[in-house]
Amino acid sequence: IGFVFQTFNLLPRSTALDNVALPLVYAGLNKTKRNERAVEVLKSVDLGDRIMHKPNELSGGQRQRVAVARALVNHPSIILADEPTGNLDSKISIEIMGLFEQIHKKGNTIIIVTHEEDIALYAHRIIRLIDGKIASDEMNPHIKTYEESIKSVVDE
């Protein structure tokens, strides 16, 4: 299981590379293997040019992509994302949801917790909770895609 935090939870004095490689320490990989895999995953989230940057040198969207990369580095089949776009502007939110769309197409299950209806529309299934109880559980008949979303932003 990989986990994406709303507030990124990156180590402030560590580079993007070290933040992403951290879970691999606990997996028992040696430093060379950790760094190779971390670089590969950072490149997959379009941060190949930011590998040696610390969190304070990255934008909010870049920090969230580092957090996503960290969640992916152990090749989890399930990713839990807590308000992954909560601290981001709408354009960067669309980019993050596009990234999740790509990850899902590779076979990963992604569970997103959000209060934002427009973000929930990217899901195949939407479960709404009220006071901790399931209020509705529906399949989404029209799943929002990155392509649709980015086009609507460009058209505005």
What are these regions, as identified by a protein language model?
Residues 1-122:
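ABC family nucleotide-binding domain
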Residues 9, 25, 47, 128-134, ...:
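A generic structural signal for secondary-structure junctions
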Residues 122-128:
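Conserved catalytic segment of ABC-fold P-loop ATPases
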Residues 133-156:
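Conserved beta-strand-loop-alpha-helix hinge in the C-terminal portion
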